Amino acid sequence: MAPLLGTLALLLLPWIARGADAGAAPPYLPRKGLALTLWAREPEVADPVALNFDDQGRLYVAETARRGTVDIDIRSHPDWLVDDLSNRSIDDLRRFFRTRMSVAQSEANARWLPDHNRDGVHDWRDLMGIQERIRLLEDPGHSGHATRSTLFYEGFHEEVTGVLAGVFPWNGDVFATVYPDLWRLRDPRHTGTPVAVESVAHGFGVHAAFDGHDLHGLVMGPDGKIYFSQGD
């Protein structure tokens, strides 16, 4: 990884960078002795939630499309609350969603659930119509900004899947947190494409709860253990 040489490269979130003039003043001033430069922006990266560098200076970004679209928020369905609180497992939650968003209730669902999979029915299958992404950004020429953007992985879209809210590369693996799982994506040769995707821990988030209150802050601790926070 190239030395920083007193320059701070910042990945600006889309709500800052979108539509902004590239020559405009930065949104805030860095500390004295540092320079603020744009490292990546749309369309190279979009809707970032979390990011982490690997030991080769490559940046992995968790991008969400499910947040605010198909990640159910119990506040929008107060009549579901009591039944939702009775869920004790992901299988319970899956059955609950399939009951509340059945084909028979398509007309009622249409008031709030778009036909994401375009099958003419507003049901639980529409929750599977939008996928999450892990983006890989690189600066192989050490130019000071990302010159290569590739899609590392796209998926995580079952009806019970929440928001991809954590990503952490480690020793040829890329770990990702998205309700209801902690995932490991194997890329031992650092090709930029996983050769295997497996759930290493399952069962988080048995209630609909609040949209976006998911599994965040994925890190490797000094003891070699994986840590992350869990929302409601």
Residue ranges and their predicted role:
Residues 18-232:
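Beta-propeller domains with acidic blade repeats across secreted/periplasmic ectodomains
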Residues 1-2, 231:
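A compositional/structural signature marking long, glycine- and acidic/polar-rich segments
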Residues 3-15:
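Bacterial N-terminal signal peptides
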